[in-house]
Amino acid sequence: GLGSYIIDIHDGGGAGTIVKKVPPYGLPYGVTVSADIDNLMLTGRCVSVDSVVMSSLRVMPTCMVLGEGAGTAAAMAVKKKILPADVNVKQLRKKLVENGVLDCRDVEVFT
């Protein structure tokens, strides 16, 4: 999937906001796979990223893309009787593109 929201960090102490435009970026499958529980996947704002990435990723369009990817991967894992960590990412990407999800390698970046 593809994320594209600005980096938008709000200072907890009220000192201001940091805003930075970023080009569209790919969302790696690994952020949705639990490192501790074999059959657990995470999506939306629960994925494993640092606070800077979360400041861009936290918006609903990006959360929906993560959900589409995690849901498709979960279906593939169940169908093949494998764990989420064992899903073939190339096959997942192909299925997502077939389903209409943009691949960041195919997006022209305007700055």
List each language-model region with its residue ranges.
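Internal hydrophobic alpha-helix adjacent to the cofactor/substrate pocket in enzyme cavities
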Residues: M64-L83
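Short, conserved micro-motifs enriched in small and acidic residues
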Residues: L57-V65
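Ubiquitous "structural anchor" signal
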Residues: I9-D11, V52, A75, K79, ...
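Non-catalytic terminal regions with compositionally biased, polar/charged low complexity
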Residues: V78-T111
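Mobile, glycine/GP-rich and aromatic-enriched active-site lid/loop segments adjacent to catalytic centers
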Residues: G1-L42, V47-V53
